[in-house]
């Protein structure tokens, strides 16, 4: 298997381009908290073999790499989409909004935007390429996944201080047994996604 950096470099050669961006999201499947999307254009000579899918890294390593990526990119953009917005748009449309916004807001217009996943995204004057399991294949996407994950985890850690009974620090808003039990016991919060089936079910049971 070729390295993530080689994957990106080959794409640059094949497409004869200079600026390549990578985009990924964090928190799309969560029951609580925002959806976070990040896009990044890295310096061409930057590489760190430790960088991979953010979910495969421990929190301390992710934070160190987050700081390193910020220092070694030409530009990056992060958008935080609230749980209310996710409910209003639906998770897919919220993700698409995040990808479009962060890519369009980059100070340097990428010649090609690599996006994690298989959903077709069309941008005006910017070519896009969807990469399934992109955070495992592309260095740029892996870097964007770290930016998104670290940003989102910090928000959930803050929620943990505000709502200590829900243990957001451990499950980060995902649908775990402990999280569901806390919702049943202490109630549905404003930061919960009311359109998600587990939340709908608890809402019906407690109404």
Swiss-Prot record:
Q: What is its EC number?
A: 3.1.26.4
Indicate the segments forming the RNase H type-2 domain, all copies.
18-207
Q: Where in the cell is it found?
A: Cytoplasm
Q: Name one GO biological process term.
A: mismatch repair
- Molecular-function annotations in GO: manganese ion binding; RNA binding; RNA-DNA hybrid ribonuclease activity
Q: What are the GO cellular component annotations?
A: cytoplasm; ribonuclease H2 complex
Give the top-level enzyme category. Answer: hydrolase
Q: Pfam families attached here?
A: RNase_HII
Q: Which UniProt keywords apply?
A: Cytoplasm, Endonuclease, Hydrolase, Manganese, Metal-binding, Nuclease
List required co-factors: Mn(2+); Mg(2+)
Q: Which reaction does it catalyse?
A: Endonucleolytic cleavage to 5'-phosphomonoester
Q: How is the cofactor bound?
A: Manganese or magnesium. Binds 1 divalent metal ion per monomer in the absence of substrate. May bind a second metal ion after substrate binding.
The keyword Cytoplasm belongs to this UniProt entry's keyword annotation: yes
List the Gene3D superfamilies. Answer: Ribonuclease H-like superfamily/Ribonuclease H
Per UniProt, a divalent metal cation binds at 24-25, 116
Tell me where on the tree of life, at the top rank, the source sits: Bacteria
Entries under NCBIfam families matching the protein: PRK00015.1-3
Q: What does this protein do?
A: Endonuclease that specifically degrades the RNA of RNA-DNA hybrids.
Q: Which HAMAP family match?
A: RNase_HII_B
Q: Which family does it belong to?
A: Belongs to the RNase HII family.
Indicate what this protein is called per its UniProt record: Ribonuclease HII
């Amino acid at each position: 298997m070729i390295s993530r950096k080689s994957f990106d470099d080959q794409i640059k050669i094949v497409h004869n381009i200079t600026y390549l961006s990578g985009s990924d999201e964090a928190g799309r499947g969560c029951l609580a908290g925002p959806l976070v999307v990040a896009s990044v254009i890295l310096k061409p000579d930057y590489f760190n073999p430790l960088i991979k899918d953010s979910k495969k890294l421990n929190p301390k390593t992710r934070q160190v790499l987050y700081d390193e990526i910020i220092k070694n990119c030409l530009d990056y953009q992060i958008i935080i989409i609230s749980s209310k917005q996710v409910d209003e748009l639906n998770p897919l449309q919220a993700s698409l909004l995040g990808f479009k916004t962060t890519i369009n807001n980059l100070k340097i217009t990428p010649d090609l935007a690599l996006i994690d996943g298989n959903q077709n995204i069309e941008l005006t004057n910017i070519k896009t390429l969807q990469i399934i399991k992109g955070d495992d294949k592309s260095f740029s996407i892996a870097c964007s996944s770290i930016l998104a994950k670290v940003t989102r985890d910090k928000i959930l850690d803050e929620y943990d201080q505000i709502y200590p009974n829900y243990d957001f620090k451990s499950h980060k808003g995902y649908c775990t047994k402990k999280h569901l039990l806390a919702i049943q016991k202490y109630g549905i919060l404003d930061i919960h996604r009311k359109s998600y089936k587990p939340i709908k079910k608890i809402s019906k049971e407690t109404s």
